[in-house]
Amino acid sequence: MGMSMGKIKIDALIDNTYKTIEDKAVIYLYLINSILKDRDFKPYFYVELHKEKVENEDIEKIKEFLLKNDLLKFVENIEVVKKIILRKEKEVIKIIATHPQKVPKLRKIKECEIVKEIYEHDIPFAKRYLIDNEIIPMTYWDFENKKPVSIEIPKLKSVAFDMEVYNRDTEPNPERDPILMASFWDENGGKVITYKEFNHPNIEVVKNEKELIKKIIETLKEYDVIYTYNGDNFDFPYLKARAKIYGIDINLGKDGEELKIKRGGMEYRSYIPGRVHIDLYPISRRLLKLTKYTLEDVVYNLFGIEKLKIPHTKIVDYWANNDKTLIEYSLQDAKYTYKIGKYFFPLEVMFSRIVNQTPFEITRMSSGQMVEYLLMKRAFKENMIVPNKPDEEEYRRRVLTTYEGGYVKEPEKGMFEDIISMDFRCHPKGTKVVVKGKGIVNIEDVKEGNYVLGIDGWQKVKKVWKYEYEGELINVNGLKCTPNHKIPLRYKIKHKKINKNDYLVRDIYAKSLLTKFKGEGKLILCKDFETIGNYEKYINDMDEDFILKSELIGILLAEGHLLRRDIEYFDSSRGKKRISHQYRVEITVNEDEKDFIEKIKYIFKKLFNYELYVRRKKGTKAITLGCAKKDIYLKIEEILKNKEKYLPNAILRGFFEGDGYVNTVRRAVVVNQGTNNYDKIKFIASLLDRLGIKYSFYTYSYEERGKKLKRYVIEIFSKGDLIKFSILISFISRRKNNLLNEIIRQKTLYKIGDYGFYDLDDVCVSLESYKGEVYDLTLEGRPYYFANGILTHNSLYPSIIISYNISPDTLDCECCKDVSEKILGHWFCKKKEGLIPKTLRNLIERRINIKRRMKKMAEIGEINEEYNLLDYEQKSLKILANSILPDEYLTIIEEDGIKVVKIGEYIDDLMRKHKDKIKFSGISEILETKNLKTFSFDKITKKCEIKKVKALIRHPYFGKAYKIKLRSGRTIKVTRGHSLFKYENGKIVEVKGDDVRFGDLIVVPKKLTCVDKEVVINIPKRLINADEEEIKDLVITKHKDKAFFVKLKKTLEDIENNKLKVIFDDCILYLKELGLIDYNIIKKINKVDIKILDEEKFKAYKKYFDTVIEHGNFKKGRCNIQYIKIKDYIANIPDKEFEDCEIGAYSGKINALLKLDEKLAKFLGFFVTRGRLKKQKLKGETVYEISVYKSLPEYQKEIAETFKEVFGAGSMVKDKVTMDNKIVYLVLKYIFKCGDKDKKHIPEELFLASESVIKSFLDGFLKAKKNSHKGTSTFMAKDEKYLNQLMILFNLVGIPTRFTPVKNKGYKLTLNPKYGTVKDLMLDEVKEIEAFEYSGYVYDLSVEDNENFLVNNIYAHNSVYGYLAFPRARFYSRECAEIVTYLGRKYILETVKEAEKFGFKVLYIDTDGFYAIWKEKISKEELIKKAMEFVEYINSKLPGTMELEFEGYFKRGIFVTKKRYALIDENGRVTVKGLEFVRRDWSNIAKITQRRVLEALLVEGSIEKAKKIIQDVIKDLREKKIKKEDLIIYTQLTKDPKEYKTTAPHVEIAKKLMREGKRIKVGDIIGYIIVKGTKSISERAKLPEEVDIDDIDVNYYIDNQILPPVLRIMEAVGVSKNELKKEGAQLTLDKFFK
């Protein structure tokens, strides 16, 4: 550390930064009592070369590159050092920069040809300093001996600070609204500083706001730590803005530095150099699990205190009335901010020490970022280079790669006593299974890595379990298993709303079949168990050459040719003609089919000892593998002649690999053949028949270039037949097999009895005794396999990482490849401890030692400050230790228009068209794009933006999905992990499908950004694909005289021949303007140098021009040419060519380039609404009628005038405006796609136009839409896509919309719904959430910058999991993450099994904890003894540092569902996880009832008492014995009452108060009581002072207030809703204790 210590010996570092002094970066270390400066620490980064050793010449090349790019001046020194990059040590170059701000410029060095990669160039300089140096922040540090001297938290002066500002009807504006007061609270109490007198003892009055600001600065400078609640984003930015108005600098820094407001991601960061500003809002969000994070909510949840609340909009009233309540409110803000700060501060200090970064940075880091800096510190100590953050392409690849998550046991529902908690640190011999390549074998002979016959085909065996067992076996139809083994049964669903043919598959304990089974379930059998087993044995014994010849037959039938030609040639040596007999065997495949190519090469090498030649077709990915040997040709010809004698399975494998594919949309295997291949397809069908694989055979006819053709299609669709295909045939390539396996997994088992692969049988059960070994298998994929032909079931993280040495730098090392255990195909180094395991081991050992010290201290009663500090540290150590469904409408911006498309169809179609460009990542498919854009929004500015779509993505998914319906009628279907955006506490935050809740305010667009493009339609180009009958008499007129055509023809010929004899200036200038050529005039030699810019376009233009010259009709300075003559060339002709052209029939032409201006837009508005196209014969002539029908008389004249302005014609006839013009008819039909009365369509070009053009369209649209029966604020249509288009158009001009399905009528679009808005966004409330199971493709977009896009007019996002699996992590490893979760599942399952064998009944287990009871009633002491014995036993079986630890004894507990339970220990401490607490907007009676019910169940163990509490409350309510105050419901206004389209109780009360002259604003909390009556709930809401207790609606309060908070808990212990209302049978307590 290059700095002078002076007299400093012991002090504590609280902050660090750097400053630029005399162009040099100086590190500032802010201690409690002084400031240290380090001028010697320099910024640096590493450069890796393509070679292992760095030579002097390499340094010179680096210097030369830097000098050439004017960068060498930014380099202070260049060194060669040795560093470890992942697993390998090598020489790298260390570039030391002159200043941190020069490092980004020096990154250009990556472009140097000898450079492979650059590292550590993006680590902030001040953070880099703390990584490289030993000093630990927030610790009393001995600077002389460089070590900590105490664990005590440094004594720092701390204060909480809060401001109140003038708040008008909207959000406060610092340009306009003053600061009214500031409150402060420290260890001695608090005060409020203001410039107005109030009657309050804790007030200090200054002269005005300017003096108030000065006083705030003066006060804050007295403290080391400043607590705020949302100070980053509100208090400090507002203070700085107001200070600027008065010319005051906010010099709050310890060395007089100014307050710095920085942007950090989505938020601001208010930084005070040398002081610790702790914003408690992000900490609360990180550490607490709440529904809302207001200061009031956090105070209540942490301390049970209800602080004083004043709505922000009421502050002005309190201020005006000098109401001292405002002072008390402000003071409480500071007081409770201080209290929260003191609560969290010790934990944040421990994070700061462990991660080695300052508390300002730590409090703004996510857990993942903390882990990253911890690993970077460890990497520095280990001399390892820190990996780079991923670029966008790598990030998307990581995001798209998924794996199976951790294991959670579904809990035993009910109430239990004497629970112990622990925390993580089968079939007999002779059972038959089918093993791939072996046939039917005994289960004891199965090896790990074998593939056995499972529910979805071949499934890999990950683990074979073997136990000694003595006891009873259950014999189920000949399959013997232990009593706790699970057998899946198929049940018919009995529900009137469910299809009678639907079924479900449930796992049943074998022992349950003896007692509970009633005969309705069916065993699931494999019909072909023995056949498949025999086939596998047969294949295993078969000669390989025979199989290869069979595969070759299939390959040649699909992709091969046998070519024999006799070529005559003259043999000059013999002086006569001779015949050459040529023999060739050729197979053509795509170069990307690597597995297929390797197989073909292997077959020829193995059978004929021949290396195939390879020939590539120019400009394509097609390659031909060939053989020109006569003897090989004849052998293959003989094999093909006898193809019926070969193995059908292998023939089909070769054929389907070549010509077949997996249709992932229909989930089928498909192969098709053309007209001439009927015999071939019938042969393939016959082979499938021989194997018993069912298929569908289709023939469809079509016409191509005048020829009538046919295609023959075979499709294998059913799950059973797909499984048989995968088992008996399969594909050659891994990619196709992966897709096949995926579609099999997606297929349901609902109709399992109908599948050929499966069979069903009634259950027959018996019991027998057994002593000996029992076995079970753990499989990849679904946990089911066939044993004796019957389907059967098979039976932490930090510790796992350490035990297996899991780390990216130990993954798949070469040194341990042959000795390390293989897990999911990977292994980890045994010789060197990895970076992540070492870091975790240190953390865990540190935590274990701390907990031991704490335990000893607790035993002797030393629960003091040191104990509390240790507790904070161990807690901090513990803390450190998905997509859219296909039918949703995506809004996409293409070059020629904005399209509203179904996301699945759109992405599927593009992937079909560009299948050669698809990239694969696991089972995900990625298609990168260049010219697509979409609507997005910036989360900070809340403004809509148009962003580039970088890639389209799809991948198979099976699991839970949600249909989320919003108040506006918008709906979206998302997977459980896909994120939307919600508005919460003034911020926009992401919310996953799993976490969306009723009432959330979801972000949708109010205003979309216009593309604002001048849209010009090239009519000739856009009519290329029109019906030739309709365009055959079209003519293009070009306004140029013949002389120009002659000169241009000559110029084109001369340029083509590169002999420009005569230069026509106007011609070469014209060709340059068309973008076909460029030229340079060389005056000295009087020469023009011409360069053709695009050969293909130039040739197309010349062909087009030659055709015009040949067929054109020249007269009167223009040329007429039949459109049909030049149609084939037009696609490549520049638009400018048609600037002086018209197009149409001989009568009635319009400009060939049609500008979409305001007049045309208005015409389209009229036409889309009420327009019709009609083609009819009148007097032998074809009439092309364009009409607008049934408009109101006041608009009919305007419509007629618009017709004439745009197209020069149009007349009013009765109830319509009409014209006859063929070219206009064609433009409307083929380009704008309008005029079909049954299918309305808005021209896509319109979406690209300016806002004024869109407004003109909407003006015409609304006028045409309006009639005597309807207004213009609501539109009905049956076509969802059409209304989606219309919704976007209105959003483009800033008009918000509501989209509502209407039963049996389609959809309704409403304009200007009165919803809350934030800039370009509208806030739409969640009204319905429907969960469902989905299997199939899901889709996503990668969008530049914002990573969000518009689906169903809702903004959607995507999300990630875990640090190792976090796609933006530096130390990312999907393989490591997958292995960690796999091993977690494995050891949890092992522990459950061992616990059950030991005598425990496991109630619930996941990666967080283990809860169990003893199977029989025993004493507490005996139970704890058993638990300790089991801990010792299981820890001897668990690997390495992975341990089960006895956590405690619980007197009683209630288990509801996964992750939802409540427990009480001996001392009355209650642990609650996941159970829904009452919401703020429930009445007090709801809160009281829930609390009393939990007390009755947990403290007393009395279900009857809990039930009676609820029943008594209901009884008291019916008898009106409840206090009226306990029935008041409080609900917050989320927008102006006038903006609510539909009403609600609190809205009606608010409107009533406003009518009475009361001031009501957004955010106000309204109290009301519901009274009885027949009107709606909203109309029956009354102010509490208006209500007598006899008026209340008893049933409303029972069903909506009392029961909801307790019903889930009571149902878990077996009490129904009817019983609670005294409407059902009574239950006894004994029934529920297990």
Curated annotation (Swiss-Prot):
NCBIfam families linked: intein_Cterm, intein_Nterm, pol2
Family: Belongs to the DNA polymerase type-B family.
Protein modification: This protein undergoes a protein self splicing that involves a post-translational excision of the intervening region (intein) followed by peptide ligation.
EC nos: 2.7.7.7
GO annotation terms (biological process): DNA-templated DNA replication; intein-mediated protein splicing
Residue ranges occupied by any DOD-type homing endonuclease domain in the UniProt entry: 552-693, 1163-1295
Keywords noted in UniProt: Autocatalytic cleavage, DNA replication, DNA-binding, DNA-directed DNA polymerase, Nucleotidyltransferase, Protein splicing, Repeat, Transferase
Enzyme class: transferase
One Pfam family it belongs to: DNA_pol_B
Catalytic activity: DNA(n) + a 2'-deoxyribonucleoside 5'-triphosphate = DNA(n+1) + diphosphate
Any one GO MF annotation of this record: DNA-directed DNA polymerase activity
Protein name: DNA polymerase
SMART domains registered for this protein in UniProt: HintC, HintN, POLBc
Gene from which this protein is expressed: pol
InterPro entries, alphabetized: DNA-dir_DNA_pol_B, DNA-dir_DNA_pol_B_CS, DNA-dir_DNA_pol_B_exonuc, DNA-dir_DNA_pol_B_multi_dom, DNA/RNA_pol_sf, DNA_pol_B_thumb, DNA_pol_palm_dom_sf, DNA_pol_type-B
Disulphide connectivity of cysteines: none
The UniProt record lists the keyword Ribonucleoprotein: no
UniProt key word Metal-binding: no
